[in-house]
Regions:
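GAF sensory/regulatory domain recognition
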Residues: 16, 20, 28-60
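A short, aliphatic-rich beta-strand micro-motif
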Residues: 102-110
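Sensory-domain boundary capping and coupling elements
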Residues: 109-123
Length: 154
């Protein structure tokens, strides 16, 4: 099995590509892989623009109780939010107030019919209409994460 640092580097590479493609402010992967010490309450992977606050090590929120995460688990499809201040599914207040996110895309990572984790794409410059290119990049990142998970399962 691959070590957790190696896997985290692979996750970070996927998220860096997603950050560049979408021109977002921050991308994260939260995922449960107990054998590697990964838990959804602390990002297993992250990429940020200079000046953006990292979410790594910020474990004060039980992520699975957050409304957006419950929506992902129920719907099993991406959640695209152009304006977090008026979003129908509320994002955590800290994401907006402390980390400055104003728009986001979230996509579940489903393994064996369970939501093992999710990818987040945050934009902090203002509201944003996410494009088809942006959502395709998110879908591709989920596929890349699935490929990494398949490799470490072998």
């Amino acid at each position: 099995m691959t070590g957790s640092q190696d896997v985290a580097r692979q996750f970070d590479a996927v998220l860096s590509k997603l950050l560049d493609t979408t021109k977002a402010s921050r991308t994260t992967l939260r995922i449960d892989i107990p054998a590697l010490g990964f838990n959804v309450n602390d990002p297993a992977g992250e990429a940020t623009r200079p000046g953006e606050k990292s979410l790594r090590g910020e474990t004060g929120i039980n992520q699975r109780t957050v409304e957006t995460v419950k929506w992902l688990d129920r719907e099993r499809r991406p959640l695209i939010q152009d304006d977090l201040l008026t979003a129908e599914v509320p994002a955590p207040a800290a994401l907006i107030e402390i980390y400055g996110a104003r728009a986001q895309m979230l996509a579940p990572v489903i393994v064996e019919n369970a939501m093992q984790g999710w990818i987040s794409v945050h934009y902090s410059t203002g509201t944003r209409s996410w494009s088809a290119t942006d959502t395709a990049a998110l879908d591709a990142a989920v596929s890349d994460i699935h490929a990494i998970l398949a490799d470490i399962a072998d």
